[in-house]
Amino acid sequence: MSEIFDAKAFLKTVTSQPGVYRMYDAGGTVIYVGKAKDLKKRLSSYFRSNLASRKTEALVAQIQHIDVTVTHTETEALLLEHNYIKLYQPRYNVLLRDDKSYPFIFLSGDTHPRLAMHRGAKHAKGEYFGPFPNGYAVRETLALLQKIFPIRQCENSVYRNRSRPCLQYQIGRCLGPCVAGLVSEEEYTQQVEYVRLFLSGKDDQVLTQLIARMEKASQDLAFEEAARIRDQIQAVRRVTEKQFVSNAGDDLDVIGVAFDAGMACVHVLFIRQGKVLGSRSYFPKVPGGTELGEVVETFVGQFYLQGSQMRTLPGEILLDFNLSDKTLLADSLSELAGRRIHVQTKPRGDRARYLKLARTNAATALVTKLSQQSTITQRLTALATVLKLPAIKRMECFDISHTMGEQTVASCVVFDANGPLRAEYRRYNIAGITPGDDYAAMNQVLRRRYGKAIEESKIPDVILIDGGKGQLAQAKAVFAELDVPWDKHRPLLLGVAKGADRKAGLETLFFEPEGEGFSLPPDSPALHVIQHIRDESHDHAIGGHRKKRAKVKNTSTLETIEGVGPKRRQMLLKYMGGLQGLRNASVEEIAKVPGISQGLAEKIFWSLKH
């Protein structure tokens, strides 16, 4: 217990109502957030002589101050607790590392509806199907749907400006509603309805309707139409035969847990209309000494009560762990959803099979993660030995990417003792430098990254500079000029130059911009972790550069051409079938567009070519 914090005096002021408490250390940082049905009773338990665990002892020893927020109900306390955990990320709480919203398939409410992937708030008019475990699962499903039910997936801006069908129509992946006369309203509406039924799990209805249409087409001697529908029926059957489907039409999430060596894996199966849409493994950050019960309860609360997760609530949640606050959680989720949500821990039949599958996946993923962590730990230990450091708890790496000096992007990737910390990866758009000046770009990104206050835990032990002596010299110069409240001498600056022909294993490392560098054996674990973080940084920089370049490319050059306003721009895109068609057009073809003179056509042609 802290000598400064007077627990007895504090407890005299605490009410017995429900609420949330925040514990602070001497630096004013929130180190733990908790909730209680009875605040006085719960907080008193922290200051007994016989504490429940070493984790609690370590926590109490650091308490300098406690804030209490009283709530009307336990449900309010539960919601507020998880909002505070997300806000403060306290080091003694179990933390869900990835709280990105889940992707859905969106069927728009347009006259000719389109299919698309959607994340975030559901403001757009239309229908949402999901959630899916990740973007890959959505893209894979969209590609499949496009082959079976050819409704459009293009953006409205493209759809509204076409005067002739695109390649998707030519290869049979779209019915071409953008061009009048290619498909009837009735046919397009029918295909949209098939998509709606298919995504709702009503495959039998889709097949029944398609079979009826095929038989009618045969009776009407429309054999080509009958053959096309037959192919569609076969495609639907191929897809549905591969899926494990519960007869009950379950709409639920199944959560399996594995816990070993202080690490937890929570595996979630997403099941809608009896179909497994996919699954995902989570590895929450678990403070030392945390019991499995706290891991599960905190994870489930954060998973459903933080941010946009509450938008994806199923009708039922299956768990392989008996929660002490199961009723409170179910009531809170039901209140949020506006309907009854059941939390079940002892399922039977198909549900028991689902739970066994989730538990097996959690155990398998945990074994893999522990193996990877062991490898990362060995590599970081080897690198610390090479660099003569006691340990490496955090390492950051920088890289620059551009095309002939244009759309320059710098990346910063972060590794900790467990490997990549992707939530902390950052990209920086570089501006105000001579195009192609990588040294100036590195100088700018380092000043932006480190020229400000940094939390003690976020100060890297090693900063890896990709680019060799010149880039390392820039880093040294920046750090020499930094005037910051944290210890700027703590990070070790390390330059890495690519080997001959950029061949992996031939890298040269530099502590100083002058003099000779040194190399590590190709099979060195220390070199492997350097290659890993450098490659991550390189890929992250290139990804950002490509996005920026695509954005510039898509922000049509037409907008910068004098004499081409919104109406002419729309006419050009509509007449030529999009920007690509316009880029490929000759001066004579551009001049045929209504409202475009010969002189303006030449200006547009040369602007797009150069």
From Swiss-Prot:
Residue ranges annotated for the UVR domain, each copy included: 204-239
Stored CDD domains: GIY-YIG_UvrC_Cho
Residue span(s) of domain GIY-YIG: 16-94
SUPFAM superfamilies per the UniProt record, alphabetical: C-terminal UvrC-binding domain of UvrB, GIY-YIG endonuclease, RuvA domain 2-like
Keyword Transmembrane helix: no
InterPro entries assigned: GIY-YIG_endonuc, GIY-YIG_endonuc_sf, GIY-YIG_UvrC_Cho, Hlx-hairpin-Hlx_DNA-bd_motif, RuvA_2-like, UVR_dom, UVR_dom_sf, UvrABC_protein_C
Subcellular locations according to the entry: Cytoplasm
An example Gene Ontology CC term for this record: cytoplasm
Keywords: Cytoplasm, DNA damage, DNA excision, DNA repair, Excision nuclease, SOS response
GO biological process, one term: SOS response
GO molecular function: DNA binding; excinuclease ABC activity
Biological role: The UvrABC repair system catalyzes the recognition and processing of DNA lesions. UvrC both incises the 5' and 3' sides of the lesion. The N-terminal half is responsible for the 3' incision and the C-terminal half is responsible for the 5' incision.
Record note on quaternary structure: Interacts with UvrB in an incision complex.
Similarity comment: family membership: Belongs to the UvrC family.
Record protein name field: UvrABC system protein C
Native species: Salmonella typhi
Gene from which the chain derives: uvrC
